């Protein structure tokens, strides 16, 4: 919903793409289409998570099976989302890593690091300079360096700090979990669920040991592990900040930052 609002300039009550999978009405123009009217080809690095208008495609069109389509108007340069990891995994191979199999295990800790029922905040097997965030940043910077006096537009859409909650060193333990506050909550899961039907439904949904590849039941973590997970989340935010700084520094170095 927020992404659709960003792309269209409309409130969710107007564009009505209010959940992942809710189609975005094709009658709405968007940022990418308007940029094309100005003679600029908008480039996408990452994902736009757009659900196509089913009235504009055949009933058997594969795009109807996903909410991870590209927003009309964008040229996808580097495609990356949880449903498509191949580009990043190929890049990891180029950096000398063994390719994870299956693909989603790139976000898993090795079995010897896992304690049953506990959240694991050990570092990912890849270095910070090879993370999914760094992968998108690297390719976006490569493109920026090739622009000189022409107009350009890049939409860099990184996944993080979205789960899976696993981070490369030092971001996995950049924040001390002991310094963090516990979330505001009821006295028990049962009491929380009784507050609203949505909370009850949500508890049922996440009552699993594979919610976003977490390798632990995120609903039933002890207080310490809740804070460890929170610390990893904050670390992922800081990792994004660091990579944005890399881009801003490049813009200053190339002079592009003066034109934004």
What are these regions (language model features)?
Residues 1-260:
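Formylglycine-dependent sulfatase
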């Amino acid at each position: 919903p927020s992404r659709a609002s960003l792309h269209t300039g409309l409130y969710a009550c107007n564009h009505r793409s209010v959940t992942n999978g809710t189609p975005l009405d094709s009658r709405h123009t968007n940022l990418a289409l308007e940029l094309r009217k100005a003679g600029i080809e908008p480039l996408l690095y990452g994902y736009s998570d757009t659900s196509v208008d089913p009235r504009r495609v055949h009933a058997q069109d594969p795009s109807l099976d996903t909410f991870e389509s590209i927003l009309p108007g964008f040229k996808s340069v580097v495609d990356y989302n949880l449903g498509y990891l191949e580009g990043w995994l190929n890049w990891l191979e180029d950096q000398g890593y063994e390719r994870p199999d299956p693909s989603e295990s790139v976000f898993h800790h090795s079995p010897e690091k896992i304690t049953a029922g506990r959240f694991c905040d050990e570092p990912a097997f890849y270095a910070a300079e090879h993370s999914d965030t760094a992968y998108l940043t690297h390719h976006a910077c490569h493109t920026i360096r090739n622009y000189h006096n022409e107009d350009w537009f890049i939409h860099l859409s990184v996944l993080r700090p979205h789960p899976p909650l696993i981070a490369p060193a030092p971001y996995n333990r950049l924040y001390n979990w002991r310094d963090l506050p516990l979330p505001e909550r009821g006295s028990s899961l049962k009491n929380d669920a009784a507050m609203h039907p949505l909370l009850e439904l949500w508890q049922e949904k996440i009552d699993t040991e594979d919610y976003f590849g977490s390798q632990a039941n995120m609903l039933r973590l002890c207080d310490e592990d809740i804070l460890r997970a929170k610390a990893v989340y904050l670390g992922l935010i800081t990792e994004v900040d660091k990579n944005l700084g890399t881009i801003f520094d490049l813009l200053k170095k190339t002079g592009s930052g003066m034109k934004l």
